UniProtKB/Swiss-Prot annotation:
The keyword Repeat is annotated on this UniProt entry: no
Pfam families with a match to the protein in the record: Wtap
Residue ranges with Acidic residues bias: 1-12
Biased composition range(s): Polar residues: 17-26
Keywords associated with the record: Acetylation, Coiled coil, mRNA processing, mRNA splicing, Nucleus
Region (Disordered): 1-43
Family membership noted in the UniProt record: Belongs to the fl(2)d family.
This protein's name: FKBP12-interacting protein of 37 kDa
GO biological process, alphabetically ordered: meristem maintenance; mRNA modification; mRNA processing; regulation of alternative mRNA splicing, via spliceosome; RNA methylation; RNA splicing
Function: Probable regulatory subunit of the N6-methyltransferase complex, a multiprotein complex that mediates N6-methyladenosine (m6A) methylation at the 5'-[AG]GAC-3' consensus sites of some mRNAs. Associates with MTA, MTB, VIR and HAKAI to form the m6A writer complex which is essential for adenosine methylation at specific mRNA sequences. N6-methyladenosine (m6A) plays a role in mRNA stability, processing, translation efficiency and editing. Essential protein required during endosperm development and embryogenesis. Involved in endoreduplication, especially in trichomes.
Disruption of the gene: reported phenotype: Embryogenesis arrest at the midglobular stage.
Amino acid sequence: MEFSSQDDDFGGDDSAANATRASGNRRSFGDLEDDEDDIFGSTTVAPGVRTGMILSLRGSLKNCKDDLASCQNELESAKTEIQKWKSAFQNESFVPAGKSPEPRFLIDYIQNLKSSEKSLKEQLEIAKRKEASCIVQYAKREQEMAELKSAVRDLKSQLKPASMQARRLLLDPAIHEEFSRLKNLVEEKDKKIKELQDNIAAVTFTPQSKNGKMLMAKCRTLQEENEEIGHQAAEGKIHELAIKLAMQKSQNAELRSQFEGLYKHMEELTNDVERSNETVIILQEKLEEKEKEIERVKKGLEIVSELVGDKKDEVDEIDEDAKEEIAGGE
């Protein structure tokens, strides 16, 4: 509210006129019902002091208006920032279609992320247990493969020339002892054969005879059958071991591929969990900062509103008193 120059100086320097007005027509502050509410203290306050107080209150009101304008600008900037965040979250999957983004949607999304993280951790624990069992099975398979390889080496050594095989067998004390026992038995058998041959020769039984030819033919047949049976047994065992080895190799390859796939899946799950944790932490920090900023702006606005209301009431009372004084002086 603006005042004229006459209203500001209350009649200029004419002290006599002021005194006449004060003694004649001006209403005294003593006539007020409550003297304690008199902001000027008493009726002896000079008009210049009142004018200074009015001017100071006007300056305070202007400062309050400036503060209010700055606070409103800050509020607008905060609203703009909030709108930016809302527009940033508008196209996110956790915001329902046709609705504006709200903090509860973000909180629900974060809670869902936490629950999914918990389920992923449980799946990771299950995968780790499966991995441990696969490692144990793989170790068992490796041990079986080592045993099969040793068996194959033994079979290969059995297929080597007789001299090398005999030399290797003689290095074993148990085999050497068995070989010595068999050698003694062979010598005894040779002695018995010689005695039998002597007896046959004594009864004129020779290989050229009919019985001798039949016996020799039967012996050759038995020897061939024994050799064939030995070859068949050796070949069947080798073939069986080769089949088992091929099956074991295929199983090991399958287990290895499954283990590699499981390991890749675990790495992907770990990366997803880490990214989810980072996103959740960043969003929580930003949300806390914005909440603090909004609370700070609200508190500032409340304080400014209270100050502006008090200042306006004081200025209105002073203006009314000034008008009444001016009217009474006139």
